[in-house]
């Protein structure tokens, strides 16, 4: 007798059910509260999202925020790789960097935003804060990934006089990649949260953070939720695209014969 397929609690069907259940709970809460100044339902939010997508200012705000935050992330990504390589090669470099990394990890993001407002214009602050918040995460994981490279393979590479590039490509990169990908999962979400928070506090014009601030001031709760939905959608798409590109580059670098 054929066994019935078991329900997979982590499968797509389960995830879809959980999402639909969350929407139902959201709609029920909106109906029970019955106050649009406190909570609006998903139907109203979806309608407002569609309206916003038809407005030019929406795309300008999304483009501005995406450009600034992605710039901050990419700069932090490159800086983390360089600093991790230096720290792995020279112990004194890690010692010198440690106070700065600890400071960024422990000081509240709001403090950095307020300080940055004294140094930078409101339209540049999101890139700076995104860079600052994700750098320690990327640096720590990149350093750990480099140090996890097999020492026996590195010694063999030294004996056979492999070039530095081949050592990096064939030994260090396969060890580094999982740590880097894990760090990017965390950092990509963190940079959007911190960057948009900076825009809200700085009241940056024509940015997602600025739109969220305006929605709060004018009690446009539908706009507040709609901009949040758009922000989440853009951040998810950016994360998926970057991780796909990272996997592609790593795999091609490892397989490359040169």
Name each region found by the language model.
Residues 1-20, 240-258:
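Transmembrane alpha-helical segments of polytopic membrane transport and secretion proteins
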Residues 6, 32-74:
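Periplasmic/extracellular loop-to-transmembrane helix junction in inner-membrane transport proteins
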Residues 71-101, 114:
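Transmembrane-helix boundary motif in ABC transporter permease subunits
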Residues 91, 182, 225-258:
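C-terminal transmembrane helix and the adjacent membrane-cytosol boundary/short C-terminal tail
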Residues 102-137, 144-145:
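Generic hydrophobic transmembrane alpha-helix motif, especially the helices
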Residues 128, 132, 165-198, 226, ...:
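Transmembrane alpha-helices
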Residues 141-180, 212:
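Short cytoplasmic-facing helical segments at TM-TM junctions of multi-pass membrane proteins
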Residues 183-233, 243:
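Non-cytoplasmic
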């Amino acid at each position: 007798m054929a066994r019935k397929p078991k329900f997979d609690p982590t499968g797509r069907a389960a995830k879809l059910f959980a999402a639909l259940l969350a929407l139902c709970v959201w709609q029920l809460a909106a109906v029970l509260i019955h106050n649009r100044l406190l909570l609006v339902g998903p139907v109203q939010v979806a309608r407002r999202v569609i309206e916003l997508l038809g407005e030019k200012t929406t795309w300008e705000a999304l483009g501005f925020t995406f450009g600034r935050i992605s710039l901050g992330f990419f700069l932090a990504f490159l800086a983390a790789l360089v600093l991790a390589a230096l720290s792995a090669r020279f112990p004194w470099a890690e010692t010198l960097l440690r106070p700065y990394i600890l400071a960024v990890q422990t000081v509240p993001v709001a403090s950095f935003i307020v300080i940055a407002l004294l140094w930078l214009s409101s339209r540049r602050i999101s890139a700076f804060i995104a860079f600052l918040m994700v750098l320690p995460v990327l640096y720590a994981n990149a350093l750990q990934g480099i140090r996890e490279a097999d020492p026996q393979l590195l010694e063999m590479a030294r004996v056979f006089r492999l070039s530095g590039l081949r050592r990096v490509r064939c030994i260090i990169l396969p060890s580094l990649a999982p740590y880097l990908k894990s760090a990017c999962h965390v950092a990509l979400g963190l940079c959007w949260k911190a960057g948009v928070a900076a825009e809200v506090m700085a009241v940056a014009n024509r940015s997602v953070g600025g739109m969220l601030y305006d929605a709060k001031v004018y009690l446009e709760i539908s706009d507040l939720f709609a901009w949040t939905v758009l922000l989440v959608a853009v951040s998810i798409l950016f994360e998926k695209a970057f991780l796909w590109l990272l996997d592609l580059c790593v795999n091609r670098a490892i397989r490359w014969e040169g």
